[in-house]
Each structure stands twice: as C-alpha cells, then as structure tokens.
Regions:
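Conserved beta-propeller blade signature
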Residues: 20-22, 30, 63-65, 104-107, ...
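Residue-level detector of Asp-centered blade-edge/turn motifs that repeat once per structural unit
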Residues: 15-18, 58-61, 99-102, 147-151, ...
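Loop/turn residues immediately N-terminal
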Residues: 27-30, 69-72, 110-115, 159-164, ...
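Beta-rich catalytic cores
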Residues: 9, 25, 50, 91-92, ...
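Conserved Ser/Thr-centered positions that define the repeating blades of beta-propeller domains
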Residues: 1, 24, 32-33, 76, ...
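Short, small-residue-biased leader/transition segments that mark boundaries at the very start
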Residues: 2-7
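Conserved beta-strand position repeated once per blade in WD40 beta-propeller domains
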Residues: 12-15, 51-55, 94, 144, ...
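Surface loop/turn motifs at the tips and blade-to-blade linkers of beta-strand repeat domains
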Residues: 43-46, 86-89, 135-137, 179-183
Length: 206
C-alpha cells in the first residue's frame, strides 16, 4: 500500500535510478518510484516483523499478544496467517496476559512505559511510567517484566540494585521496590508455579 513516508530506522538503500529506490528498514521493504515523495510497502508474503515478547491467552490458543521491534504491540486472535490488530504504537516490549483472569493484559513500549487492558484486550490505556528521581528513564530500553496472576503483582526491572513491584495491578496501586544488589540489571523473571510469592530472577551477568 502507498504511504507518504516509510519507517525511519533504515538498514539498506538501493538506488535503481534517480527516482526508483528500494529501502529496507524495521518495517520491511519499501519502494519509491518518485524520488521519495511516496512509498509502497513490498512485504506481501514476507515475514519481516521481529517479536521481542509474546503472551498466549489461557483459554484461546489462537489469541496472542506480542511486542515487536519498532512496530508496536499487536493482538493476533485468528488461526493462520491473518492480519492482527495493532493495540499500541512505538517499540513494543514485554507482553503479558493474566492466566487467571485474562481481562487483564499488559504491554510496554520502552524503559518503564507500561500500558494495560482491563477488558480482555479490546482497549489499552497508559498504566505506569516509572523514572529515576532525576526524571531519566529507568531500566533497559526493552525492559523485562513479569506478572503474578495469582497475587496480581507486577515486577519490573528498575536498576542494578532494585526491582519495582506493582502491588495490585487490578487498580492504579502504589508501587514499592525490592532492594537487592543483583550486580547487574534483571533480564529474566519467572514466578513460581508451585509456591505463592516466590520470584526467580536472572541477570545480565548470569
């Protein structure tokens, strides 16, 4: 389809002539035949989207929520190679669906920017954007997080010595910090499926 611009993060440019140019970028392959005034997306039958994270619905295996590299967060809920619905723009980050109550779904953009759905993914709104005390971004660019569907808690990487905990994600609750010197930022989480309140953490250094 035609559009007035293509995605800015380009990886390669091929000049066919002075007006016809092929570009590859985070959105796939684009062609301009008028020197860059308009672009046509050339992604038919090509898989060009990279998912950072996906979450699967507990009762509908065709329903997937996923954050993609520079292409937003998408909801896919039909079998096969069908078009999905972009539920949030920008860079997509970690995605979560509450396995106990799937009305609660979460996605993220960059750093501590988290958005939430309370109606099963039909709509999303901004939920949390925690920053350092000086207002700078906290955590990683694509920031790891996890939810505990039993206790309705969310854990988010903050810095090398603390993990942010949202105590009750069913509402706009206060957060606190789990202060532990990890040596490096937390990059992976796993909520114990056996013992309530137990969280396993992996870090950038092991």
């Amino acid at each position: 389809r035609q559009r007035q611009m293509c995605i800015r993060d380009s990886h390669n440019i091929v000049f066919i002539d002075s007006d016809k140019i092929l570009m590859s970028n985070d959105g796939g392959v684009f062609l301009t035949t008028d020197g860059g005034n308009t672009f046509t997306m050339k992604n038919d039958n090509m898989v060009t989207t990279q998912f950072y994270s996906t979450a699967i619905h507990p009762t509908d295996s065709d329903y997937v929520l996923g954050g993609t590299q520079d292409n937003g967060t998408w909801r896919l809920n039909t079998a096969g190679k069908q078009a999905g619905v972009e539920v949030y723009g920008g860079d997509g980050g970690f995605a979560h669906i509450d396995q106990v109550d799937p009305d609660y779904q979460f996605g993220a953009t960059t750093y501590g920017n988290i958005f939430r759905s309370v109606n099963g993914g039909q709509s999303f709104g901004s939920y949390s954007n925690v920053t350092n005390s000086d207002g700078t971004d906290a955590g990683f660019f694509i920031n790891p997080s996890v939810i505990d569907g039993v206790n309705k808690a969310m854990y988010v990487t903050f810095d090398t010595v603390s993990i942010l905990r949202q105590k009750d994600y069913t509402k706009l609750s206060a957060h606190d910090f789990i202060n532990i010197n990890l040596g490096s930022g937390a990059t992976a989480y796993k909520v114990s499926p056996h013992t309530s309140g137990v969280l396993f953490v992996g870090t950038a250094s092991g």
